[in-house]
Amino acid sequence: MVLGFSWLPPEINSARMFAGAGSGPLFAAASAWEGLAADLWASASSFESVLAALTTGPWTGPASMSMAAAASPYVGWLSTVASQAQLAAIQARAAATAFEAALAATVHPTAVTANRVSLASLIAANVLGQNTPAIAATEFDYLEMWAQDVAAMVGYHAGAKSVAATLAPFSLPPVSLAGLAAQVGTQVAGMATTASAAVTPVVEGAMASVPTVMSGMQSLVSQLPLQHASMLFLPVRILTSPITTLASMARESATRLGPPAGGLAAANTPNPSGAAIPAFKPLGGRELGAGMSAGLGQAQLVGSMSVPPTWQGSIPISMASSAMSGLGVPPNPVALTQAAGAAGGGMPMMLMPMSISGAGAGMPGGLMDRDGAGWHVTQARLTVIPRTGVG
């Protein structure tokens, strides 16, 4: 290559040196390499701090040690590459400086052109040989320009070669991050498989023991005597005992009083004619209010609050008092009891409950004794005790 520079005239060498891009791209490349070196140094420092946290921080264990061992080569590689990038920046700047020196040593193309123009003029005017010394001096100057350009090119070539020889090729990273992630994923999958293999027998054993436990409970229940099961109905018996007692007393009283009188029998007689059922006759010759009425699903009132019918105090007492109004002066209860005992052979009179089916035609207005004779009941001050529900 030196021979090439030596054989090229100054017009070509000077034109090549001054016609290029100059040293600007080399200086830009040097700045870029410096920035890359700074980024690589920062990455290496960050990696090193992360590894230090893995090995000396609170999260220390086999996994952290494995990750630190896998990532440690990256720290060395980043440090090496950062140093190489910094060296490349230095060498690029040195190459730019060498080019500038070679450019300064190269003859400007205008000087070469002027020499050639001067030589041509001298040759054209050299009729009698008078311009021979001037032509020789001009040729000597041209040869000096040639030598100067060759020397500049040789020096630039030597400097660029030394700069390039100092640069070392960049090494590849030891392992890719994707490969490291795949290795970690494989290790995690292996740990999950091991844990599943350890837990599965325990779960299967627990599920296998469930039928045995259920069979034992079934056998225990089957061995219990039936009399223990009857104890479950004891609260129901206690609650229904008062109702059963009252029903027995009412049935016994009805048996002692005998068959009902004609008036009560007539009350149970059907009304085939479809005639209107007359109103109740009064006790003692007066009417028993404005007739009987019934309602379904109507709540009672205590003040302004609606309450169930079985609440104590919810049954209006005014119904009985209004229905029994006008019966006269209430009799003496003692005398009434003695009279009932004399008429019934010493048995106290029991008021029979009114039948729902016979609460219509033919019902007498007074009470009947066992012989069918009517009792004349003098008005008494009645007190109605509301019925409370069981439970």
From Swiss-Prot:
Q: Which GO terms describe its biological process?
A: response to host immune response
Superkingdom of the source species: Bacteria
Pfam families listed in its UniProt record: PPE, PPE-SVP
Family, per entry: Belongs to the mycobacterial PPE family.
Task: Please state what the protein is called.
Answer: Uncharacterized PPE family protein PPE49
Organism of provenance = Mycobacterium tuberculosis (strain CDC 1551 / Oshkosh)
The gene it comes from is PPE49
